[in-house]
Each structure stands twice: as C-alpha cells, then as structure tokens.
Regions:
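Conserved core of the sugar-phosphate nucleotidyltransferase
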Residues: 1-86, 94-97, 101, 118-133
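A C-terminal functional module that forms or caps the active site or interfaces directly
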Residues: 90
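AAA+ ATPase "lid" subdomain C-terminal helix
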Residues: 106-107
Length: 133
C-alpha cells in the first residue's frame, strides 16, 4: 500500500497525499481503517507550514494544518470498501495481542498484504470480534 501511495504522490505532484478521511468531505465512508493511515507530504509544505503555524497543537500535529489549509495542493486516496468501523492500530497491549493473532494466521506467508487480511475469514473475525471501535 505504501509503495502505491508514494507512486500516487509523485504522479499527482501534490504537496500532501493521504488515505485518511478528507476533513472537507466528512460524509465520505470510503477510507481505510485505523492503523493503515498513510500521510505523505513534501519538504516544501513542511517548511512552509512551520513558518505559518502559531498554535502548539499544529507544531505537534503539522499535517492537521496542511490538511485544513487552502495553500497546499492535496489529494485523498479512498478505499474501495467501507472500513470505517474497523481498527487495526496498536495502541494498547490488547491491540498488540490481536495483531499477533493475525500474524499467526499468516505464518506461512510473511509477505501478506492489506487486502489479504480483509479477505481472510480468520483474520477478519479477529478484527471484527475484538477491534471494532
């Protein structure tokens, strides 16, 4: 997924590209689950943001400023499916244990993909059972 996003970033020639939900399109339900967030931005946009931001929040979370500003060229990559209720980030010990279970499902194929996780019934059951927001 990351390779595809980098390719899109270069192809689109944007300042910022992401697969997270577009803040200007809040009704959109086609975005990736937590844990698969990718944000790519140019050095130029980062330096420009640094000069323009004034809040400590924006210093800490610079992409929030880039996403909400009209001065940058942005592109949001949508998913083909609705994943908004699924969470696959590792924020707690329980999350880590659940991700370990998913890795065990794919023990014979260490090169599994994002799509493989959501096509496989066992891994999808783990996610749905324990990682629903």
């Amino acid at each position: 997924m990351l390779d595809n996003m980098i390719h899109e970033f270069k192809k689109k020639k944007v300042d910022y590209l992401s697969n997270i939900k577009d803040p200007l399109n809040i009704k959109d339900e086609f975005y990736y689950p937590d844990g698969f967030d990718i944000e790519i931005f140019s050095k130029k946009s980062l330096l420009s943001s640094y000069k323009k931001i004034s809040s400590s929040f924006d210093y800490e979370h610079v992409t929030t400023f880039i996403r909400s500003s009209n001065i940058f060229k942005k592109h949001f990559v949508k998913s083909q499916k609705k994943f908004q209720k699924l969470k696959l980030s590792v924020d707690t010990k329980k999350d880590l244990n659940n991700v370990k279970k998913i890795f065990k499902v794919f023990a014979s194929n260490i090169f599994f993909s994002f799509e493989d996780i959501f096509k496989n019934k066992k891994s999808l059951d783990i996610i749905k059972k324990q990682l629903i927001r």
